[in-house]
């Protein structure tokens, strides 16, 4: 949507794609689903709905639009070929714990990204996480390894694995980013996650 944070657009720019904005509804924070349908072309690979202020999008409508445009879809990666349709990635930076019709928004999209920034109600000061919908039957171990490599400058081993005797060698397989979460921040996040239901109340 046009009313969003820069992160939703930056990730598109990082992969060399062109972001196309879809505005919100006149009287609501949800995206305009008719405008979404009009914006989709044969170049569209991903739709990134934003759960602005914790207001969940209507994923039934989003997937209806995606399904109606299936004939336009032209996959260019293995993941895109696996889905064989536009992938839906929810920006859940404001939506930890948000549900729609009793279902977590993370389970409504194909993937969901979360922010644990200092201003969020579950924080590790910085950082975030990505989840994927188990109903899509992705290879979770392979997905985890792929995200791990991306977050470690493209290295095939993390710092702990490299310090074990005889394990200092590693490969750099892609031009990744340095965005792995330190253990201390992760521990803070896990402790907050345990008490998160109380925080929501």
Residue map of PLM features:
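PLP-dependent aminotransferase-like
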Residues: 1-92, 99
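Hydrophobic/aromatic ligand-binding patch that stacks against planar heteroaromatic rings
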Residues: 10-12, 104, 184
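Residue-level signal for well-ordered, solvent-exposed loop/turn and beta-edge residues enriched
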Residues: 28-30, 103, 129
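Short, hinge-like loop/turn segments at secondary-structure boundaries
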Residues: 37-39, 65-66, 105-107, 130-132
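Active-site region of PLP-dependent enzymes
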Residues: 76-81, 94-101, 108-201
């Amino acid at each position: 949507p046009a009313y969003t944070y820069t992160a939703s657009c930056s990730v598109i720019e990082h992969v060399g794609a062109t972001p196309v904005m879809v505005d919100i509804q006149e009287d609501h924070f949800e995206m305009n689903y008719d405008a979404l349908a009009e914006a989709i072309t044969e170049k569209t690979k991903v739709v990134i709905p934003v759960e602005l202020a914790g207001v969940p999008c209507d994923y039934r409508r989003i997937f209806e639009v995606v399904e109606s445009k299936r004939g336009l879809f032209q996959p260019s990666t293995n993941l895109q070929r696996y889905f064989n349709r536009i992938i839906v990635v929810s920006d859940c930076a404001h939506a930890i714990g948000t549900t729609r019709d009793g279902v977590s928004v993370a389970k409504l999209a194909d993937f969901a990204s979360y922010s644990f920034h200092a201003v969020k109600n579950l924080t590790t000061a910085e950082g975030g996480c990505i989840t994927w919908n188990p109903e899509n039957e992705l290879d979770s171990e392979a997905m985890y390894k792929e995200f791990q490599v991306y977050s470690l400058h493209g290295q095939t081993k993390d710092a702990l694995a490299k310090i074990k005797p005889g394990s200092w060698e590693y490969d750099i397989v892609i031009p990744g980013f340095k965005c792995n979460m330190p253990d201390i921040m992760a521990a803070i996040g896990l402790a907050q996650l345990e008490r998160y239901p109380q925080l929501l109340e």
